[in-house]
Every structure is written in C-alpha cells, then in structure tokens.
Amino acid sequence: MGQKINPLGFRLGTTQSHDSIWFAQPTNYSENIQEDKKIRDCIKNYIQKNIRISSGVEGIGQIKIQKRIDLIQVIIYMGFPKLLIEGKSQKIEELQTNMQKKLNCVNRKLNIAIVKVANAYKHPNIIAEFIAGQLKNRVSFRKAMKKAIELTEQAGTKGVQVQIAGRIDGKEIARVEWIREGRVPLQTIRAKIDYCCYTVRTIYGVLGIKVWIFSK
C-alpha cells in the first residue's frame, strides 16, 4: 500500500523551513509547543472577530514564531492585510496585549510584525479558507473547487490539487472528491510544494479540505 507522508515535513531542509524557530531543554519542550499553539490560536481568533473581508477569507498565509530568552518575535504573513490599512498600530497593540494576557509573558518582550504576501492565492491556507467560505454559503462543492483552481492558476502556479472529504452537499454517506490541474509531483523532494489541511463546520457536519500547490 502507498504510504502518504506530509509534503511539508518531507521537504524540511530543502524547499521548506520550520514555522517555529527556538531551542529548549527537554523538560520545557512541551510547554514551548503549547505556547506556540496559543499564539497561533490567539491570532486566528482575533482576526476572525475583528477583521473579515467580504469573501469570508481571513487571509492568513503563514505564522512564523522566533523565540529568544528575552523576546518572542511573531511574523504574520497575510494576503489581505486589513490590519495594515485601518488603524494598524492600534490593532497590533490590542493583539499584543491580548496575547500577553494569555501567555503571561514575564521578562519577555512580545513583538508582532505583519508582512503582505505578494500573491495571496499562491498560499494553500488562503485557498482552503476560500473553499470553506463557499461551502458554508451552500455553494456547490464542484463550483467552489473550480473557482479555487482558477484563482491559483491566475496567481501563476504550475499545478494545484484540491480534495474535500465528508458529507458533501449533505449526502448521508461520506465520500472524498478531488480535482487536479497541472503537475503536482509529490515524490520529487526538490519540488516546492505547499500543503494545507483545513477543517470546516457546515450545517451537515464537518468537512476536511486539503490543498496542494506546486509553485516551482
């Protein structure tokens, strides 16, 4: 049987890099991982509550965390950075204070930076959010998948694959539907493939969305 490996972990050190960069003693390792999860969840929740564009996409491409003894540096890569436009400094300060309360940062400075992504629809996270928004609005899954593939092709990718699993269109039996356009060489380690696994809650139940994008 074919064994499926995570495309990002498979390419670490060649075309992919770690999202979190820090060193820790074995006793503190789990605490640092939990802290990273809290940071990511806090950012996503804040953006969900405060910033939403019309299509329902939050627009977070990637969140990178770098830690030192006295500093936590968080870099948010956004496709549609509403944070950058309206009251940037005020909203970033609000997000920082929210995060500091949750993390109990003692003797450590928290610094948040927002970077605009050049081609938003080259990021699988943003594509998955777009499909999730369409499915929540009861758009046909085929239409949502085709539209997502159109958007990635316009962004200049070499290939894209989208998969949706679950009770699609409210059918009683769960199934898996997928579509591929262009090349997606999953076995080639030097191929730059971005991957995302996203969960969306609809009125019929939970659907899983997976997106593979071959950029170069």
From Swiss-Prot:
GO terms for biological process: translation. Part of the 30S ribosomal subunit. This is Small ribosomal subunit protein uS3c. It comes from the Eukaryota. It is found in: Plastid, Chloroplast. HAMAP family: Ribosomal_uS3_B (MF_01309_B). InterPro entries: KH_dom-like_a/b (IPR015946), KH_dom_type_2 (IPR004044), KH_sf_prok-type (IPR009019), Ribosomal_S3_C_sf (IPR036419), Ribosomal_uS3_bac-typ (IPR005704), Ribosomal_uS3_C (IPR001351), Ribosomal_uS3_CS (IPR018280). Residues 43-118 form the KH type-2 domain. It comes from Glycine max (Soybean). One of its GO terms (cellular component) is cytosolic small ribosomal subunit. One of its GO terms (molecular function) is structural constituent of ribosome. SUPFAM superfamilies: Prokaryotic type KH domain (KH-domain type II), Ribosomal protein S3 C-terminal domain. Signal peptide: none annotated. Belongs to the universal ribosomal protein uS3 family. Keywords: Chloroplast, Plastid, Ribonucleoprotein, Ribosomal protein, RNA-binding, rRNA-binding. The keyword Cell wall biogenesis/degradation does not apply.
